[in-house]
C-alpha cells in the first residue's frame, strides 16, 4: 500500500508542476478551503475536476488518493490506507479524493472521515451516484462545484484573447474564426491545444464513458443497444423526443429499458434532457423532452449525420452556458411551446417567477426567419407573462420592438 500511495504522490507532484488555466467558479478559494464542509467537484470526465482540486490545494499541505488507480482499489483496506496516508503525508491538513465514486462504499468511508474532522475535497464523474449518496449520508455537509468543458470566454483566454474586450466582431476575422472553432469543436481542455486530435480524442472518450461509466457500472448486457441510443441522441441533439418514439425508431422491444438507458446516459454528464415548461407537473412529465450534449465536439466526433447545422450547434452551446451559470433542467430551465405551437428554446425561472425567454437563431438576416423567431418569442411571452426577451445569434446585435415588447438580439459573444 505504501508503494501505491507513494507513486500517487509522485504523480500529484508532477501534476502540480504544470501550468494551468484558472477556471471560473462562483466560489472564493480561500473561503472554500477554510470551510469544514466537503468540497464536491463534479462534472464529466476529463473536464478539469482534478486540476481544479489540485489548484485549490496547491499552496496547502494535502494528501492525495486517485481512485482511477486499479491497484489502489484492489488492495483497498480502510485502516491500512489511513495508516499509510498518515505515514506518507505527515500532518496533512486536507485530503483530496479523486474520482471517489470508483470505490465501493465510498460514502460510508467519507462520512467516517468527516466525523473525524478531516477537511476533504472530492471529485467525481457520476451525477446520480454522487448526488444520491451524498444526499443520503451527508445532507448539508457539502458544497457542490460543477466543472464543465471550457466556456467560450475561457476558450478565448486560452488563446490569449479576452472576450469581454471584443466590441465589434464584424471587424475581426480572427475572433469570428475562434468562435466558429469553438462552435464546432467544443471546449474540452485536452483538445483546445491540439485541434487536429479533437475528433479522435472525443470519440475515444465517448466510447470510454459508454463502456466504463455506464455499461460496466450498471452491468448492461446489451451494450450495442445502449451505444445505438447514445449515438442516435447525439445525432439528434436539440430535438424533442419521447421514450416511446426512441424505442420505435431504434427497434427496441422495451420502452422501460429505453427509459433506463436514457437515465444511464445522463449520469456521467454526457447528455441533458430539457422538459417542456408547464405549471402542471404531470403534464410536463408527459411532454417530449429535448436532448442536449455536454460539448459540441461530441457531435462532430460521433453524430451520424455529416451535414452541418450551425443553428443547432449554437443552441446547444447556449444550453450548456445556461447550465454553467447555474440553471438546472426541470427546476429552473425549460423549453416552451405555445397553444399555437410556437416554440421558445429556453425558459429560465427563479422560484415560481419566469425570469427570461431565450431564442437561438444563427442568422436573422432573412425577413422570413426574423418574423418567425420574433413572433414565436412574443407569443410565448404573452402566455408566460414575461418581458425579458432575448434572441441569441452568431453575430447580430439590435433591439426589436413589436406589440409592446422589446426583444434584445445579442451575438453569442455578448450573451
Annotated model-derived regions:
Residues 41:
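Hydrophobic anchor at the beta1->P-loop junction of P-loop NTPases
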Residues 394-415:
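Domain-level recognition of nuclease-like catalytic cores that cleave nucleotide substrates
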Residues 196-354:
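Accessory nucleic acid-recognition modules appended to NTPase machines
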Residues 2-14, 133-240:
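Interdomain motor-coupling "hinge/lid" segment immediately C-terminal to the ATP-binding subdomain
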Residues 119-125, 146:
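Structural recognition of the conserved hydrophobic beta-strand(s) that form the central parallel beta-sheet
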Residues 1-32:
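A short, basic N-terminal segment
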Residues 63-93:
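Short glycine-rich substrate-engagement loop in P-loop NTPases that contacts/grips substrate
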Amino acid at each position: 500500500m505504501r508503494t501505491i500511495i507513494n507513486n500517487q504522490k509522485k504523480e500529484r507532484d508532477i501534476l502540480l508542476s504544470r501550468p494551468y488555466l484558472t477556471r471560473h467558479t462562483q466560489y472564493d478559494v480561500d473561503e472554500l478551503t477554510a470551510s469544514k464542509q466537503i468540497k464536491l467537484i463534479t462534472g464529466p470526465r476529463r473536464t478539469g475536476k482534478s486540476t481544479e482540486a489540485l489548484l485549490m490545494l496547491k499552496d496547502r499541505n494535502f494528501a492525495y488518493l486517485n481512485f482511477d488507480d486499479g491497484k489502489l482499489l484492489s488492495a483497498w483496506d480502510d485502516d491500512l490506507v489511513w495508516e499509510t496516508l498518515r505515514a506518507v503525508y505527515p500532518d496533512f491538513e486536507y485530503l483530496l479524493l479523486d474520482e471517489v465514486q470508483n470505490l465501493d462504499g465510498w460514502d460510508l468511508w467519507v462520512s467516517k472521515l468527516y466525523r473525524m474532522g478531516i477537511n476533504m475535497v472530492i471529485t467525481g464523474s457520476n451525477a446520480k451516484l454522487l448526488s444520491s449518496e451524498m444526499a443520503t449520508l451527508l445532507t448539508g455537509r457539502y458544497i457542490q462545484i460543477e466543472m464543465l468543458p471550457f466556456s467560450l470566454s475561457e476558450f478565448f483566454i486560452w488563446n490569449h484573447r479576452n472576450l469581454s474586450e471584443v466590441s465589434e466582431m464584424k471587424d475581426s476575422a480572427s475572433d469570428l474564426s475562434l468562435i466558429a472553432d469553438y462552435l464546432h469543436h467544443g471546449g474540452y481542455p485536452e483538445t483546445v491545444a491540439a485541434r487536429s486530435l479533437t475528433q479522435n480524442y472525443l470519440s475515444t472518450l465517448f466510447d470510454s464513458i459508454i463502456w466504463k461509466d455506464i455499461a460496466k457500472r450498471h452491468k448492461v448486457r446489451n451494450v450495442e443497444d445502449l451505444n445505438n441510443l447514445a449515438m442516435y441522441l447525439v445525432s439528434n441533439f436539440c430535438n424533442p423526443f419521447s421514450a416511446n418514439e426512441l424505442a420505435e425508431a431504434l427497434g427496441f422491444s422495451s420502452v422501460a429499458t429505453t427509459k433506463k438507458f436514457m437515465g444511464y446516459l445522463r449520469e456521467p454528464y454526457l447528455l441533458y434532457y430539457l422538459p417542456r415548461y408547464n405549471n402542471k407537473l404531470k403534464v410536463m412529465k408527459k411532454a417530449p423532452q429535448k436532448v442536449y450534449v455536454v460539448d459540441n465536439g461530441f457531435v462532430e466526433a460521433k453524430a451520424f449525420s455529416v451535414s452541418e447545422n450551425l443553428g443547432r450547434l449554437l443552441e446547444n452551446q447556449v444550453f450548456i452556458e445556461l447550465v454553467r451559470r447555474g440553471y438546472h433542467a426541470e427546476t429552473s430551465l425549460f423549453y416552451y411551446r405555445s397553444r399555437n405551437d410556437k416554440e421558445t428554446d429556453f425558459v429560465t425561472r427563479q422560484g415560481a417567477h419566469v425570469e427570461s425567454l431565450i431564442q437561438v437563431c444563427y442568422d436573422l438576416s432573412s425577413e422570413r426567419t426574423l418574423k418567425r423567431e420574433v413572433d414565436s418569442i412574443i407569443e410565448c411571452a404573452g402566455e408566460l407573462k414575461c418581458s425579458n426577451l432575448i434572441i441569441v445569434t452568431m453575430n447580430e446585435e439590435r433591439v426589436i420592438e413589436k406589440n409592446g415588447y422589446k426583444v434584445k438580439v445579442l451575438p453569442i459573444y455578448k450573451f
